[in-house]
């Protein structure tokens, strides 16, 4: 299945450690489009790129969905830019895991004010 690879650390930190799946094209609102989306996503995956449409993001809150959408945009742009110097390089799995663990550690601390 095509995808945007995990070549930006933030993808791993925001629930996309294997990258962003790409759903095949289907006309907007048609059963084919819905079937392609369902076939492309897995539990816990908060985004999918819809071929010939754009990104579809879903998360616990609208704020997190917007954040993940920005991360997907950053990864797509990084992939395009990297194409001019040989192509993007995926982050090794152990480093993706470390990035996610670090993000979870930060989140568990909550917001602190000075």
Task: Place the predicted regions along the sequence by residue.
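Glycine-rich flexible loops
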Residues: 1-114
């Amino acid at each position: 299945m095509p995808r945007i690879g995990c070549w930006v650390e933030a993808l791993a930190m925001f629930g996309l450690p294997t990258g962003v799946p790409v759903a095949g094209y289907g006309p907007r609102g048609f059963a084919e489009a819905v079937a392609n989306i369902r076939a492309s996503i897995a539990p816990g995956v908060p985004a999918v790129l819809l071929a010939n449409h754009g990104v579809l993001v879903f998360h616990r809150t609208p704020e997190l969905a917007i954040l993940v959408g920005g991360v997907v945009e950053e990864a797509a742009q990084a992939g395009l830019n990297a194409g001019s110097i040989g192509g993007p390089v995926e982050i090794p799995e152990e480093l993706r895991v470390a990035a996610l663990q670090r993000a979870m550690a930060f989140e568990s601390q909550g917001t602190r004010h000075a």
